[in-house]
A protein has these predicted regions:
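A short, structured loop/turn motif at beta-sheet edges
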Residues: 78-86, 109-115
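Short beta-strand edge/turn micro-motifs at domain boundaries
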Residues: 102-130
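A solvent-exposed, acidic/Ser-Thr-rich amphipathic alpha-helical stretch
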Residues: 7, 13, 26-84, 93, ...
């Protein structure tokens, strides 16, 4: 597979995750992460538990339909590091009644059995200064 085709496949994974989140499908969202060995880095903490992360999303963002908000990944930049590894950097915005979140994701993508997954996910949240959100 060419670098362009791999980058397109990675974008498709991210697009499917975004769509799953926006319909409240947390299992579908988590399908983009390597299970069980994904590593999450956020708020100064490292977490290595796929199931605990799914449980966190359901507890914190689930509940009433639509409470998960609307998630968008933008400005997606992909650099192929090897035939089975890529770096992805993107901006994200989560708009929800409980408060908006914006920031940057840095992800290590790995290819296993022909499919791309997020092996390492780093989130850097920034203050949302957009008065329209």
């Amino acid at each position: 597979m060419s670098d362009v085709m791999d980058a397109d496949a990675i974008r498709a994974v991210i697009g499917a995750m975004q769509a799953a989140w926006n319909r409240g499908d947390f299992h579908g969202y988590m399908a983009g992460f390597a299970n069980p060995d994904v590593v999450f880095v956020s708020r100064g903490r490292i977490q290595k538990d796929w199931q605990a992360t799914l449980d966190h999303y359901i507890a914190d963002y689930g509940g009433a339909p639509g409470s998960q908000g609307e998630l968008a990944f933008t400005n997606i930049r992909i650099e192929m590091l090897a035939p089975d590894a890529a770096q992805l950097i993107s901006d994200y915005r989560l708009v929800r009644a409980a408060g908006n979140q914006v920031g940057v994701n840095t992800r290590l993508m790995r290819k296993r059995d022909g499919k791309w997954f997020i092996a390492l996910n780093h989130v850097s949240q920034i203050e949302d200064r957009d008065p329209r959100s």
